[in-house]
Amino acid sequence: LTQSLSDWGGMLLLLGVHPYLTPDDLPLLDKKRYRIMYSTMKEVDTHGQWMMKATSGVQVSLDYQSLEDLERKFVILNRLTPFLTAIFANSPILEGEPSGYRSYRGRIWQNTDPYRTGLPLSFLSKKFSLVDYIEWALDVRPYHLYRDGEVVQPGPYTFRQLMKKETSLEMNQDCLLYTSDAADEEAW
C-alpha cells in the first residue's frame, strides 16, 4: 500500500483526523448526495463537515449465527465503544496544534449528528432487540432519497413519517434501489 501511494505522490497516515488541514482545505467527492449531506451537516451539529472531509477509519464486519447472537454482539460492541476509542486513539493533533484530546476523531463523532450518532440507552441494555434499532432508525430524517432517477432532499420528515405517508413526499420502492447506469452513477 505504501508503494502504491508513493507512486501517486501520496503517503499513508495512520491517523483518525487530518493533523493539519481543515474541511475548508480538503475536497469533497463530487456526488450530489455528498453535497446534500455536507450542506446539511452544518445545520445539525458542529463537526459533521469534519467527519465527512477530515477523518478516516476502519470498519470491521462481524458475522452472527442468529438474531439473538446479532443482538448480543451489538450490545457488547456498543458497550466497548469507549474502550475501543481509547485503545485506538490516534488523533491528538488538530490544525497543527495539540487538540487536548487523544482521540479528536471521537470528539468529531460525538458532535456530528445527534440523530444518527451516539449511543441510545436501549443500545446498551441487556433487553435490547433489533426492534429497538428499527424504532430508532425510523425516527431519523434521511438526508436524501433516490427518487425517479434523482437524488432528492426529503425535507424535515423522518423515515416513519414518509412511510406512513404523513407528508406530500411518499416513501416508495425506488427510494431503496440503486442502479449502476452511468447517468445515475453521476448523480448518485
Language-model features: locations:
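Loop-rich catalytic cores of soluble enzymes, especially ATP-dependent carboxylate-amine ligases
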Residues: 6-13, 17-177
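Conserved small/polar residues in nucleotide/adenosyl-binding loops
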Residues: 178-184
